[in-house]
């Protein structure tokens, strides 16, 4: 039998051992701790969300190619790893330009999903100020194709540091 989520098995075993070894966990509060521990072990990890962001970006690229959009967007092409959160926030703002220019329902759904996934991932990163990073308006304007390529690169920076 193949275990699809091996990290669940080890967490469950740890919870069982804790219950067995500590008799005071046999109270109602102990049972609540056990249940919440099991639930939290089953929550998805953020790495999967970043992969979904990349998938959504590639889908947007295919949709835009069929529409022949020629907008230019502020693009961070060589972001320093210390500025990746600032760069990602700029990319998310520029996605709104694509949304406005395309007026396409499919792109609207994808951008809303992508924004939600990215915001959820950003909220899990500690809120710190990144000094020396360029503001969005200071970035060079590039084609949508270059914008999406750079966006994927920034997301991969988040995956590599997770």
Swiss-Prot record:
Q: Which Pfam families match?
A: IL15 (PF02372)
Q: Which Gene3D superfamilies match?
A: Interleukin-15/Interleukin-21
Q: Which GO terms describe its biological process?
A: immune response; interleukin-15-mediated signaling pathway; neutrophil activation; positive regulation of cytokine production; positive regulation of immune response; positive regulation of peptidyl-tyrosine phosphorylation; positive regulation of phagocytosis; positive regulation of T cell proliferation
Matches recorded under InterPro entries: 4_helix_cytokine-like_core (IPR009079), IL-15 (IPR020439), IL-15/IL-21_fam (IPR003443), IL-15_mml (IPR020466)
Q: Which UniProt keywords apply?
A: Cytokine, Disulfide bond, Glycoprotein, Secreted, Signal
Location in or out of the cell = Secreted
**Keyword Flavoprotein attached:** no
Q: Which first-to-last residue range defines the signal peptide?
A: 1-29
User: What does the record give under GO molecular function?
Assistant: cytokine activity; cytokine receptor binding
What GO CC annotations are associated with the protein?
extracellular space
Q: Which residues are glycosylated?
A: 113, 121, 127
Cysteine disulfide partners in this protein: 83-133, 90-136
Tell me what this protein is called.
Interleukin-15
Biological source species:
Ovis aries
């Amino acid at each position: 039998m193949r275990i699809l989520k091996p990290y669940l098995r080890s967490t469950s075993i740890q919870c069982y051992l804790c219950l067995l070894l500590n008799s005071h966990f046999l109270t109602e509060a102990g049972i609540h701790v056990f249940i919440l521990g099991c639930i939290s072990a089953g929550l998805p990890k953020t790495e999967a969300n970043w992969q979904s962001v990349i998938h959504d970006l590639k889908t947007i690229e295919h949709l835009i190619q069929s529409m022949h959009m020629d907008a230019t967007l502020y693009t961070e092409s060589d972001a320093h790893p210390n500025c990746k959160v600032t760069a990602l926030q700029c990319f998310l703002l520029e996605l709104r330009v694509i949304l406005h220019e395309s007026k396409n329902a499919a792109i609207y759904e994808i951008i809303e999903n992508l924004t939600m996934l990215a915001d959820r991932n950003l909220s899990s990163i500690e809120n710190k100020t990144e000094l020396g990073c360029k503001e969005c308006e200071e970035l060079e304007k590039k084609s949508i194709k270059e914008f999406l390529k750079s966006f994927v690169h920034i997301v991969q920076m988040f995956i590599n540091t997770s």
